[in-house]
């Protein structure tokens, strides 16, 4: 006999499982400026993440 399972939507928190669209929770919109500024910010964030990963790897070795 297989264990009884619930549909995924019922097991997720309310904000992921199918809550009404207008719950009053709003995500702030961050203006990135021009396309070049947004690209620079993205590159900086990627470089920061890679540097952190490299540092963690070095610490664990």
Curated annotation (Swiss-Prot):
UniProt GO MF annotations: DNA binding
Coiled-coil annotated spans: none
Pfam families registered for this protein in UniProt: LEP503
Tissues in which the protein is found: Restricted to lens epithelial cells.
Gene Ontology biological-process entries: lens development in camera-type eye
Function: May play a role in lens epithelial cell differentiation.
Annotated protein name in UniProt: Lens epithelial cell protein LEP503
Protein species of origin: Homo sapiens (Human)
Underlying gene: LENEP
């Amino acid at each position: 006999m297989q264990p009884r399972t619930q549909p995924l939507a019922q097991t997720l928190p309310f904000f992921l499982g199918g809550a009404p669209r207008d719950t009053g929770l709003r995500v702030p919109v961050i203006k990135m400026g021009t396309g070049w500024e947004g690209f620079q910010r993205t590159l900086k964030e990627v470089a920061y993440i890679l540097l952190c990963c490299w540092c963690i790897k070095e610490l664990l070795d």
